[in-house]
């Protein structure tokens, strides 16, 4: 029995805002609820509504910049930087810049629409 899993066909999450989301591990691909790993590309001028997720989220920026508003504090990360945002913290993710932002997001437990608690726009 193999002690590893290679993912070469991630689930591409349907979106309406131009953002690419490829879930490699998590609820949609491997039915794992303890962790999700996703590769994402946020287009220029993209943003999500504020949310208060019930999961920790780790983000690593591959290229470009990503803006976070965490409890009213604005933070901008660039390529090579990372952040951990603890669960039950109000946050907004965005890319208000002129170039796309590519990054990896890891959520524990796994990302789920039932746990994200997005505010109405």
Predicted regions and their residues:
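Well-ordered beta-strand scaffold positions
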Residues: 40, 65, 73-75
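Short histidine-centered beta-strand/loop micro-motifs
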Residues: 47-53, 94-96, 115-116
